[in-house]
Amino acid sequence: MVTRKKPVKRNAEAAEIQVEQEEDASQPKVAKELMVVAQEVKIIRALACNDVVERNRQIRILRKWFKARAGSSFPFNEDDFMRIWKGLYYTMWMSDKPLVQEELAEKLAQMVDSFGGNTACSLAYFSAFMRTMCQEYFGIDQWRMDKFLMLTRRMVRYLLRFLKQNNWNADLIAAFNSSMQLSVMSEQPKSRGMTMHYLDVFFEELAKAANGEITAAQVNMFLRPFVTYIATQRDAKLVAQCRTRVLYHLMYQSDLGRQYSEKYNAWKQMGFPTASIDDIEKLDSGFDEEDDEVNAEEEQPRATSLDPRAGNVDVHMPELPLNADCVLDELQTQLRTNDFNSKRRKGLRKLIQIFETYQRGEFPLGVRTMPKVEGQTLSEMVEQKVAALDKMEDEVFATGRKLKKLNKSKRKRLLQSINFEEVDEHNYDEVISKALPPELQKKVNYNAKVRSSINNAWVVEEVKEAEPKSKKAKKEEPPQQNKDDQTKVKKKSQLKPKNDQSKPKIEDQPTLKAEKEEPAKRKKLDHSKTKEEQSKPKTDEQPKPTPKVEGQSKAKPTPKTKAAGVDDDAPTNGWDAPLEDGEQDIFVPSRKLQVKQANSKLPQSTPKQPARAEFATPQTGSGKHVRIVTKSNCIYPKSDYYRQLKLSPQVPYDANRLPGKSALKPHWIPGPIHPSYKAKRLFNDTL
């Protein structure tokens, strides 16, 4: 008997499971670490995409994924957080609008506490953020810089809150300080700007996060790395930033610093009435403390915020307790253990002196004195400076200038006449001034008077009537002509024809130079003129011209008879006697003048251009000239302005005055509407 096997019924699900098992058996197994990395890459791509919906969805998922991953068998390491922060960095990069950016910064900062209490992951998350910001800082443009600085401030705030939740654990604070010394506070920082911002905001955010619930010892744990940073950092700008924004900031926010700030603000509002700030004391208002407490209870609490806001919103900054002993110990330890240069040691010793003063209960910073300016006008100050300069100049150069006025022989005789045994450095000027001749002493006094009156621009001196003229003035003075000669020259010039103007200048004027050289001839000429004048009759006929020798001046005035009745002195010698009939007055010029006249007639090889007078102002073709007078370039006092107002009391500005006629021609169209355009009138038009 033949038996048959019953057919086995296999459903579709069982068939699919079998196919998958066969495929899994044929493919090699993938390591779980690679699967985790692939999952991270997928998350990073979603965070850095340009779709805002996808980015927001991934941010919501990321918090849950952090919590699940922290409790799994594959914990986070630093490289994982660096990859994740690469995507979060571009999420913030593409975020737009201030409120949206602030909300995103809050979400990213709140993820510090999203690891289920795993403190190591929280510190690694923050450390990876600071390393990412130091690397990407130079790639941030000016339009995105503010939101990344805001993100840094929020991250620091929420990390300090996380440390506060762990009761300021010393191990956590030490781990936090060591991680910061590897990134933002390293000896060779990658980005100076990021380090400066971190130094600027750290202790402000510590005060906000602590809210008064922190001790001086716990503050010192955060402060110690900054003191070490000041001692070891080579960048002078970072050292100055750490000194002012960390150490000085902690002193200013203390009780002593706030008292000084209040006193200085009051001193400044009063206009610095005293030379020292210690002269101001705080007085009691006179109200009872009970009344103040009642008023404080009645007042409604004002809205406060951790960040400055627009509007009437206050930022409350609690005080951080500062113990100067910790800073002094750390500074002295750094000075003992390290080999610094003289400049670094000088700066550290100055910091030690400041904190020692603060430890004694005195505030060592700020302005303590304000120099008071004496009530002097500018003119008085200028006069004092000029007088001091003149005095100094006289003390230094007075004796030397007086001696330089003398020639070599007189100076030698003057110095020989002085007994130098009685001369010392105190009476040297006095002895020299007494030994000077009176003429030079008079000149020195005159020069001193001129120098002293330069500011007034006038020199007042007494002039004697019979003061003898100097030899130099006598030489420069031209020979005087009597009144009759002047009248004769004037009449002669009136009768002179126009053609004589083209003759050389040497023939038109009297030869004064020859007269100076030959005084005997000049004397003979003068006496001959007087004789001729006496012999002339008193008729009004025109005088006959006398013959002249070649070389005689053509412009010589013709002798004219004097009026009758004029008595002249009798001639004392032959030269004073008048000319007789037939005698002629002959003037023989000097040899030098004859040679000069002969040379002037010879043709010149190089024609001499006539000398042009220097113009005071540039010459233009027009008839009008502008003369710039620098004397008038001065400041006018207010008195001139008041006098001008009295002389012309018209109103300088009249609000009711209409503008004058415009210089522009009116358009032939009265309005801006084109004449060919016909507007449609609506039913509600009122025009």
UniProtKB/Swiss-Prot annotation:
Residues 463-488, 497-520, 527-543 have a biased composition (Basic and acidic residues). Residues 596-608 have a biased composition (Polar residues). It is found in: Nucleus. InterPro entries: RRP1. Keywords: Nucleus, Phosphoprotein, rRNA processing. Residues 288-312, 463-624 are annotated as: Disordered. Pfam families: Nop52. One of its GO terms (biological process) is rRNA processing. The modification Phosphothreonine is found at residues 617, 620. GO terms for cellular component: nucleus; preribosome, small subunit precursor. The keyword Phosphoprotein applies. Residues 554-564 have a biased composition (Low complexity). The modification Phosphoserine is found at residue 622. Residues 288-298 have a biased composition (Acidic residues). May be involved in the generation of 28S rRNA. Belongs to the RRP1 family. This is Ribosomal RNA processing protein 1 homolog. It comes from Drosophila melanogaster (Fruit fly). The lineage of its organism: Eukaryota, Metazoa, Ecdysozoa, Arthropoda, Hexapoda. The gene is Nnp-1.
